[in-house]
Swiss-Prot record:
This is 2,3,4,5-tetrahydropyridine-2,6-dicarboxylate N-succinyltransferase. It comes from Variovorax paradoxus (strain S110). GO terms for biological process: diaminopimelate biosynthetic process; lysine biosynthetic process via diaminopimelate. The keyword Acyltransferase applies. The keyword Cytoplasm applies.
Protein backbone atom coordinates (compact mmCIF):
# COMPACT_ATOMS: atom_id res chain seq x y z
CA UNK A 1 0.00 0.00 0.00
CA UNK A 2 2.73 2.46 0.99
CA UNK A 3 4.75 1.76 -2.16
CA UNK A 4 1.69 2.27 -4.34
CA UNK A 5 0.91 5.54 -2.56
CA UNK A 6 4.47 6.72 -3.08
CA UNK A 7 4.33 5.94 -6.79
CA UNK A 8 1.08 7.88 -7.22
CA UNK A 9 2.39 10.87 -5.24
CA UNK A 10 5.75 10.94 -7.05
CA UNK A 11 4.04 10.84 -10.46
CA UNK A 12 1.61 13.58 -9.44
CA UNK A 13 4.49 15.70 -8.19
CA UNK A 14 6.19 15.55 -11.58
CA UNK A 15 2.91 16.67 -13.16
CA UNK A 16 2.06 19.22 -10.45
CA UNK A 17 1.80 22.13 -12.91
CA UNK A 18 -1.30 20.45 -14.34
CA UNK A 19 -2.91 19.67 -10.98
CA UNK A 20 -5.46 21.98 -9.40
CA UNK A 21 -8.63 21.86 -7.33
CA UNK A 22 -10.63 21.46 -10.54
CA UNK A 23 -8.23 19.22 -12.46
CA UNK A 24 -6.77 16.17 -10.76
CA UNK A 25 -7.27 12.43 -11.19
CA UNK A 26 -9.36 10.75 -8.50
CA UNK A 27 -6.49 8.44 -7.54
CA UNK A 28 -4.28 11.46 -6.84
CA UNK A 29 -6.95 13.10 -4.68
CA UNK A 30 -7.50 9.85 -2.79
CA UNK A 31 -3.77 9.25 -2.31
CA UNK A 32 -3.10 12.75 -1.01
CA UNK A 33 -6.11 12.61 1.31
CA UNK A 34 -4.95 9.23 2.65
CA UNK A 35 -1.48 10.61 3.41
CA UNK A 36 -2.88 13.68 5.21
CA UNK A 37 -5.22 11.45 7.21
CA UNK A 38 -2.38 9.12 8.21
CA UNK A 39 -0.21 12.09 9.19
CA UNK A 40 -3.11 13.35 11.27
CA UNK A 41 -3.34 10.11 13.26
CA UNK A 42 0.42 9.57 13.54
CA UNK A 43 0.63 6.46 11.36
CA UNK A 44 2.83 8.25 8.82
CA UNK A 45 5.64 10.71 9.52
CA UNK A 46 7.65 12.95 7.22
CA UNK A 47 10.81 11.64 8.90
CA UNK A 48 11.54 8.55 10.98
CA UNK A 49 14.36 8.09 13.47
CA UNK A 50 16.91 5.35 12.88
CA UNK A 51 19.22 6.16 15.82
CA UNK A 52 20.42 9.20 17.77
CA UNK A 53 20.72 12.04 15.27
CA UNK A 54 20.07 9.75 12.29
CA UNK A 55 16.79 10.26 10.48
CA UNK A 56 15.29 9.09 7.21
CA UNK A 57 13.28 11.78 5.42
CA UNK A 58 10.37 10.55 3.33
CA UNK A 59 10.29 13.12 0.55
CA UNK A 60 7.16 11.66 -1.03
CA UNK A 61 5.15 12.42 2.12
CA UNK A 62 6.35 16.02 2.05
CA UNK A 63 5.32 16.17 -1.62
CA UNK A 64 1.84 14.96 -0.65
CA UNK A 65 1.53 17.79 1.86
CA UNK A 66 2.49 20.32 -0.80
CA UNK A 67 0.11 18.78 -3.35
CA UNK A 68 -2.75 19.03 -0.85
CA UNK A 69 -2.62 22.81 -1.19
CA UNK A 70 -3.11 22.57 -4.96
CA UNK A 71 -6.09 20.27 -4.61
CA UNK A 72 -8.20 22.55 -2.46
CA UNK A 73 -9.58 26.07 -2.68
CA UNK A 74 -9.75 28.49 0.22
CA UNK A 75 -13.05 28.43 2.06
CA UNK A 76 -14.60 30.02 5.09
CA UNK A 77 -14.18 27.79 8.14
CA UNK A 78 -15.20 27.89 11.77
CA UNK A 79 -13.54 26.31 14.80
CA UNK A 80 -15.55 27.29 17.85
CA UNK A 81 -15.49 31.08 17.96
CA UNK A 82 -12.50 31.18 15.61
CA UNK A 83 -13.38 32.07 12.03
CA UNK A 84 -10.83 31.85 9.23
CA UNK A 85 -10.41 31.51 5.46
CA UNK A 86 -8.03 28.73 4.48
CA UNK A 87 -7.50 25.40 2.72
CA UNK A 88 -6.73 23.36 5.84
CA UNK A 89 -9.19 22.81 8.71
CA UNK A 90 -8.09 22.70 12.32
CA UNK A 91 -7.26 19.36 13.93
CA UNK A 92 -9.62 19.27 16.91
CA UNK A 93 -12.69 21.34 15.95
CA UNK A 94 -14.81 18.35 14.85
CA UNK A 95 -14.02 16.12 17.85
CA UNK A 96 -16.53 15.36 20.60
CA UNK A 97 -15.74 15.78 24.30
CA UNK A 98 -15.12 12.03 24.62
CA UNK A 99 -12.84 11.99 21.57
CA UNK A 100 -10.83 14.88 22.97
CA UNK A 101 -10.52 13.06 26.29
CA UNK A 102 -9.33 9.89 24.54
CA UNK A 103 -6.68 11.85 22.63
CA UNK A 104 -4.95 12.62 25.93
CA UNK A 105 -3.97 16.08 24.69
CA UNK A 106 -4.60 19.28 26.65
CA UNK A 107 -5.39 22.29 24.47
CA UNK A 108 -5.38 25.78 25.99
CA UNK A 109 -7.16 28.52 24.02
CA UNK A 110 -6.38 29.91 21.52
CA UNK A 111 -3.97 27.11 20.52
CA UNK A 112 -4.31 26.00 16.89
CA UNK A 113 -3.15 22.76 15.30
CA UNK A 114 -3.84 22.14 11.63
CA UNK A 115 -5.28 18.88 10.35
CA UNK A 116 -2.40 16.73 9.14
CA UNK A 117 -0.33 17.37 12.25
CA UNK A 118 -0.04 14.78 15.01
CA UNK A 119 -0.13 15.56 18.72
CA UNK A 120 0.67 12.55 20.92
CA UNK A 121 -0.93 11.59 24.21
CA UNK A 122 0.13 13.69 27.19
CA UNK A 123 1.20 16.66 25.10
CA UNK A 124 0.11 20.15 26.12
CA UNK A 125 -0.61 22.95 23.69
CA UNK A 126 -0.57 26.32 25.38
CA UNK A 127 -1.69 29.22 23.12
CA UNK A 128 0.54 28.10 20.26
CA UNK A 129 0.51 26.97 16.63
CA UNK A 130 1.29 23.57 15.10
CA UNK A 131 1.39 23.40 11.30
CA UNK A 132 0.44 20.62 8.89
CA UNK A 133 2.77 17.62 8.75
CA UNK A 134 4.32 18.31 12.14
CA UNK A 135 4.73 15.60 14.78
CA UNK A 136 4.66 16.40 18.52
CA UNK A 137 5.68 13.54 20.82
CA UNK A 138 4.25 12.26 24.10
CA UNK A 139 4.45 14.50 27.14
CA UNK A 140 5.78 17.48 25.19
CA UNK A 141 4.87 21.03 26.20
CA UNK A 142 4.41 23.59 23.43
CA UNK A 143 4.40 26.75 25.50
CA UNK A 144 2.73 30.10 24.88
CA UNK A 145 3.30 31.69 21.45
CA UNK A 146 5.59 28.86 20.36
CA UNK A 147 5.23 27.73 16.75
CA UNK A 148 5.93 24.28 15.32
CA UNK A 149 6.50 24.64 11.59
CA UNK A 150 5.28 22.43 8.77
CA UNK A 151 6.59 18.85 8.96
CA UNK A 152 8.81 19.60 12.00
CA UNK A 153 9.50 16.57 14.20
CA UNK A 154 9.34 17.14 17.96
CA UNK A 155 10.24 14.22 20.23
CA UNK A 156 8.79 13.02 23.53
CA UNK A 157 9.11 14.98 26.78
CA UNK A 158 10.36 18.10 25.03
CA UNK A 159 9.74 21.60 26.38
CA UNK A 160 9.37 24.34 23.78
CA UNK A 161 9.43 27.49 25.89
CA UNK A 162 7.46 30.67 25.30
CA UNK A 163 7.91 32.23 21.87
CA UNK A 164 10.09 29.43 20.47
CA UNK A 165 10.05 29.05 16.70
CA UNK A 166 10.66 25.67 15.07
CA UNK A 167 11.02 26.15 11.33
CA UNK A 168 8.95 24.45 8.66
CA UNK A 169 9.83 23.00 5.27
CA UNK A 170 7.19 24.34 2.90
CA UNK A 171 8.35 27.93 2.41
CA UNK A 172 11.15 28.44 1.80
CA UNK A 173 11.30 24.85 0.58
CA UNK A 174 13.71 22.77 2.67
CA UNK A 175 15.24 19.36 1.94
CA UNK A 176 14.56 17.99 5.42
CA UNK A 177 12.46 18.95 8.44
CA UNK A 178 13.70 20.63 11.57
CA UNK A 179 14.04 17.98 14.28
CA UNK A 180 14.06 18.25 18.07
CA UNK A 181 14.75 14.84 19.59
CA UNK A 182 13.47 13.40 22.89
CA UNK A 183 14.01 15.11 26.25
CA UNK A 184 15.25 18.43 24.88
CA UNK A 185 14.61 21.82 26.46
CA UNK A 186 14.43 24.79 24.08
CA UNK A 187 14.72 28.13 25.89
CA UNK A 188 12.37 31.07 25.44
CA UNK A 189 12.43 32.97 22.13
CA UNK A 190 14.92 30.56 20.55
CA UNK A 191 14.65 29.70 16.85
CA UNK A 192 15.68 26.41 15.23
CA UNK A 193 15.13 26.35 11.47
CA UNK A 194 16.26 25.05 8.05
CA UNK A 195 16.31 21.35 8.90
CA UNK A 196 18.69 21.64 11.87
CA UNK A 197 18.72 18.59 14.17
CA UNK A 198 18.89 19.02 17.96
CA UNK A 199 19.88 15.61 19.28
CA UNK A 200 18.31 14.07 22.39
CA UNK A 201 18.77 15.39 25.94
CA UNK A 202 20.10 18.76 24.79
CA UNK A 203 19.33 22.16 26.30
CA UNK A 204 19.23 25.45 24.39
CA UNK A 205 19.37 28.58 26.52
CA UNK A 206 17.10 31.55 26.00
CA UNK A 207 17.44 33.34 22.66
CA UNK A 208 19.56 30.79 20.77
CA UNK A 209 19.17 31.00 16.99
CA UNK A 210 20.35 28.09 14.83
CA UNK A 211 20.03 27.67 11.07
CA UNK A 212 22.14 25.67 8.62
CA UNK A 213 24.68 28.49 8.30
CA UNK A 214 25.00 29.17 12.04
CA UNK A 215 28.41 28.14 13.44
CA UNK A 216 28.02 25.75 16.38
CA UNK A 217 31.21 26.10 18.43
CA UNK A 218 32.20 23.55 21.06
CA UNK A 219 34.04 25.39 23.82
CA UNK A 220 35.74 22.24 25.13
CA UNK A 221 37.08 20.88 21.84
CA UNK A 222 37.41 24.06 19.80
CA UNK A 223 35.54 22.41 16.92
CA UNK A 224 32.98 24.23 14.80
CA UNK A 225 30.12 22.37 13.14
CA UNK A 226 26.89 23.21 11.33
CA UNK A 227 23.33 21.94 11.21
CA UNK A 228 23.39 19.61 14.21
CA UNK A 229 23.69 19.89 17.99
CA UNK A 230 25.20 16.71 19.52
CA UNK A 231 23.29 14.71 22.12
CA UNK A 232 23.39 16.07 25.67
CA UNK A 233 24.73 19.52 24.77
CA UNK A 234 24.06 22.75 26.65
CA UNK A 235 24.00 25.60 24.14
CA UNK A 236 23.93 29.37 24.61
CA UNK A 237 24.13 32.27 22.18
CA UNK A 238 27.51 33.94 21.70
CA UNK A 239 30.02 35.27 19.20
CA UNK A 240 33.19 34.14 17.45
CA UNK A 241 36.06 36.54 16.67
CA UNK A 242 36.85 37.23 13.00
CA UNK A 243 39.24 39.40 11.02
CA UNK A 244 38.81 41.22 7.74
CA UNK A 245 41.41 40.89 4.98
CA UNK A 246 42.93 44.12 6.23
CA UNK A 247 43.25 42.71 9.74
CA UNK A 248 40.36 44.59 11.30
CA UNK A 249 38.68 42.59 14.05
CA UNK A 250 34.96 41.92 14.35
CA UNK A 251 32.70 39.13 15.58
CA UNK A 252 29.90 37.01 14.16
CA UNK A 253 27.01 35.31 15.91
CA UNK A 254 27.43 31.66 16.91
CA UNK A 255 25.75 29.03 19.04
CA UNK A 256 28.18 27.96 21.76
CA UNK A 257 28.21 24.48 23.31
CA UNK A 258 29.39 25.29 26.83
CA UNK A 259 29.10 21.85 28.44
CA UNK A 260 27.19 18.59 28.47
CA UNK A 261 23.98 18.22 30.42
CA UNK A 262 24.56 17.42 34.11
CA UNK A 263 22.40 17.05 37.20
CA UNK A 264 22.38 20.80 37.84
CA UNK A 265 21.15 21.48 34.32
CA UNK A 266 18.44 18.85 34.64
CA UNK A 267 17.21 20.31 37.93
CA UNK A 268 16.62 23.63 36.18
CA UNK A 269 14.95 22.21 33.07
CA UNK A 270 13.00 19.19 34.36
CA UNK A 271 9.38 18.77 33.33
CA UNK A 272 6.66 19.26 35.93
CA UNK A 273 4.56 16.10 36.34
CA UNK A 274 1.87 18.13 38.13
CA UNK A 275 1.05 19.78 34.80
CA UNK A 276 0.60 16.43 33.07
CA UNK A 277 -2.04 14.71 35.20
Amino acid sequence: MTQQLQQIIDAAWEDRANISSSAAPAEVRDAVEHVISELNNGKLRVATRESVGQWTVHQWIKKAVLLSFRLKDNEQMQAGSLGFYDKVPTKFSHLSANELKESGVRIVPPAVARRGSYIAKGAILMPSYVNIGAYVGEGTMVDTWATVGSCAQIGANVHLSGGVGIGGVLEPLQAGPTIIEDNCFIGARSEVVEGVVIEENSVLGMGVYIGQSTPIFNRDTGETSFGRVPSGSVVISGNLPKKTKSGQEYSTYAAIIVKTVDAQTRSKTSLNDLLRD
